Amino acid sequence: MKQLTRKKIIIGISLFLIAIVVTLVIYFLTRGESYDEEVPIVKFPFKNLFDENKKPLNIILISAPFREIEHEKLYSKYKNQGLAFCGISSYLEFPGHIDNPHEDRFHEERKHDYTKMVSAWLHCFRQEKIPQNLKDSGMPLLLMTEADLKWVDDTPLPPMQKEYDFIYCCLEDNSKCDPGWQSYIRNWDLAKKCLEVMCSQFHLKGILVGRTNCEFTDKCNGIVKVTPFLPYNEFQTEMKKCKFLFVPNISDASPRVITEAICYNMPVLVNYNIVGGWHNVISGVTGEFFTNETDIIPQLTKITTNYNSYQPRSWFQANRGAKISGKILADFLKQNYPDLNNKEVQYATVTI
């Protein structure tokens, strides 16, 4: 009788444990499927990830340093909701030390360690320039920028008459043209030296967006048009009138303008030391690199004499974009986020 009672107890406990296991399995399997309904649409410095059906994934990107206590509270709120986090280098040298002397230092005062807030990181750096805190983190890293995910279709571009040789964007910082945040990241000091070469030696016509209150070489008088800040659509229209894009920037993580120019089939002339976007500059195909006002000369010669041989748009269509880079990103997320709410995602994109 005692043995029978003991068997009943054992069977009862076993059934109870099995029920708990089954309940937990069902919970974890179904939790991810319905999670997309709960994912908030976030704002800077956070960004959303979306699947190919434009449904938000349950991974929130941290794209820049926090600016205020409210950002800290939002991080805690999203974390408590069960959302996962991934870092992305979309802002200056983030998550490394930000060199721009005009940058907000709230994150340093609060001693934020963003590499400990996330499970993986999408970065933009050359291998030798990866910040030490990213190297030391041991987390999975992927070379991927937001601009790599730009949607570009196979539709040929309609022919457009080129009115200018180049375009360069450096927005105003203040009314006196004193050094500021914009002039630092757009490398205005180097740009002025290069503009003198471009105008005096090559007689190139160009558009300079943003520096309406700044003086630079008179060699460009009459051949370089200076405009104030342009709304996005107007800027795109002006850019399409130019043959190539000039980018002397260094402290720039993911210049969307580089990808936009490439997709307009414009070669790009880019500072070799730029933080991000360098991986889309392929010599003789999408553009050329330079570092100063001296070594820009042979690169200008190359672009201006071989302009029609560059095929930047075709290269981007074959190597980047939502369906190619987006698939790489989706595979990276599936590999490193086991609780991803869409385990069948084909490609992922980021809010830009």
What are these regions (language model features)?
Residues 236, 255-263, 278-279:
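Short alpha-helical segment that forms part of, or immediately flanks, the ligand-binding pocket
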Residues 272-284, 288-289:
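Short acidic/histidine- and often glycine-rich active-site loop of Leloir-type glycosyltransferases
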Residues 250:
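Aromatic "clamp/platform" in nucleotide-sugar-dependent glycosyltransferases that forms part
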Residues 149-222:
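Conserved catalytic-core segment of nucleotide-activated headgroup transferases in glycan assembly
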Residues 63-180:
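Catalytic core of nucleotide-activated saccharide and alditol-phosphate transferases
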Residues 291, 304-352:
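A charged, aromatic-enriched C-terminal amphipathic alpha-helix characteristic of glycosyltransferases
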Residues 267-271:
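Short hydrophobic beta-strand element within catalytic cores of glycosyltransferases
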Residues 243, 265-266:
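A short alpha->beta transition loop at the rim of the catalytic pocket in nucleotide-sugar-dependent
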